Every structure is written in C-alpha cells, then in structure tokens.
C-alpha cells in the first residue's frame, strides 16, 4: 500500500485500470468507451479511487499515481499507442 492510500483498502484491479486511463488523460466519456461501461460506472470507480487515495482532484491524483509508481510511464504509453492507432484507423 502506498502512503496516500489512507483508507487502508487497496485499489481494485478495475480501479487501477481506470486510474491508468485517467493518468493518460482520457475523459470520463472516453474511459467508459474504452472499458465498455457507462459513464456512471466510471464515476463510481473514480469515487472509490478518491475515497481510498484521499486526494482532491484528478490533477493531484495523476501526480500521486506517477510519483507512487502506481501507474508507470509504460502503462500510459500503451494507452496512447492504442488511441493513436484507433485515430489512424478512423
């Protein structure tokens, strides 16, 4: 568990997946499309992440995720590659 996970409850696999997409810069709508879920479901995952990590916003969440190595630069690059290839295919 990292220092900011103050609730004592670790992030779920799905929350980590959502977090990676947030760090890559995707919007709630884009995350929902990427995961094949509703925006409401994404919001629920975000609420869970914010409750566990205890940060005030997505900017601080992104900084925390990178500085704590919860999300790696390689994870972000993989998301970007996927999105670029989707844009090129369109």
What is each stretch, according to the model?
Residues 3-6, 51-90:
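Basic, Lys/Arg-enriched C-terminal extension of HTH/homeodomain DNA-binding domains
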Residues 25-60:
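Recognition helix of helix-turn-helix DNA-binding domains
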């Amino acid at each position: 568990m990292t220092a900011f996970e103050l609730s004592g409850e670790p992030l779920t696999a799905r929350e980590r997946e959502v977090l990676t997409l947030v760090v890559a810069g995707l919007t709630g709508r884009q995350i929902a499309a990427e995961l094949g879920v509703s925006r409401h479901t994404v919001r629920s995952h975000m609420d869970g992440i914010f409750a566990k990590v205890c940060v005030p916003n997505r900017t601080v969440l992104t900084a925390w995720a990178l500085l704590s190595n919860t999300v790696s630069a390689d994870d972000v690059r993989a998301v970007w590659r996927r999105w670029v290839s989707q844009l090129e295919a369109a």
